[in-house]
Amino acid sequence: MYVAIEGVDTCGKSTQIALLKRRFPGAIFTKEPGGTALGMKLRELLLGGEAKSAKAELLLFLADRAEHMELVIKPALDKLLFSDRSLISGMAYAKGWDELWLKSLNLFATEGIVPDKVVILELTAKELSYRLSQKSHDSIESRGVEYLLELQERIKQMTALLGIPSLTLSASLSPEEIHGRIVSGFVLKG
């Protein structure tokens, strides 16, 4: 089973991945962007704001996604696989493009493979503002709360567009409570 953990920056994806690693030590864990050697280089470019045009940014994400699919996801499809982000985030971040065209491009990059299930960690504006105030920002986080809240909505929209079963949880719950809901209410149900 391929499970993607989605949400905007600071929502707790990394914390949940760490808890899932302890709970499922035999599972495969990856992230997007950056789940391959090429992906790490592309991630640095993307988070550093090196891509100045929206088209260049989109193409870098798609290159990472295709490489990640070939080297990490496809070989692990018969195992329990957790990914910190997926094509859903890539589509959500690619604002300003036709959604059906984005879907086609991303499905081309993934060879039609999408997560079996998606967990979306959702933040309120107040909680997001607080969490952002507690850390330094990369080029995406520096776009601000309004941008990230819009992105959060797009993550939900892209999940629906792809028709993937999802579980949306409040990221303001304790990490342990979120973890329990992911495991009992979603992952273990198969």
Swiss-Prot record:
<keyword id="KW-0547">Nucleotide-binding</keyword>
<keyword id="KW-0545">Nucleotide biosynthesis</keyword>
<dbReference type="GO" id="GO:0006227">
    <property type="term" value="P:dUDP biosynthetic process"/>
</dbReference>
<comment type="function">
    <text>Phosphorylation of dTMP to form dTDP in both de novo and salvage pathways of dTTP synthesis.</text>
</comment>
<comment type="similarity">
    <text>Belongs to the thymidylate kinase family.</text>
</comment>
<dbReference type="InterPro" id="IPR039430">
    <property type="entry name" value="Thymidylate_kin-like_dom"/>
</dbReference>
<keyword id="KW-0418">Kinase</keyword>
<dbReference type="InterPro" id="IPR027417">
    <property type="entry name" value="P-loop_NTPase"/>
</dbReference>
<dbReference type="GO" id="GO:0004798">
    <property type="term" value="F:dTMP kinase activity"/>
</dbReference>
<dbReference type="GO" id="GO:0006235">
    <property type="term" value="P:dTTP biosynthetic process"/>
</dbReference>
<dbReference type="GO" id="GO:0005829">
    <property type="term" value="C:cytosol"/>
</dbReference>
<feature type="binding site">
    <location>
        <begin position="7"/>
        <end position="14"/>
    </location>
    <ligand>
        <name>ATP</name>
    </ligand>
</feature>
<dbReference type="GO" id="GO:0006233">
    <property type="term" value="P:dTDP biosynthetic process"/>
</dbReference>
<keyword id="KW-0808">Transferase</keyword>
<dbReference type="InterPro" id="IPR018094">
    <property type="entry name" value="Thymidylate_kinase"/>
</dbReference>
<dbReference type="GO" id="GO:0005524">
    <property type="term" value="F:ATP binding"/>
</dbReference>
<dbReference type="Pfam" id="PF02223">
    <property type="entry name" value="Thymidylate_kin"/>
</dbReference>
<keyword id="KW-0067">ATP-binding</keyword>
<protein>
    <recommendedName>
        <fullName>Thymidylate kinase</fullName>
        <ecNumber>2.7.4.9</ecNumber>
    </recommendedName>
</protein>
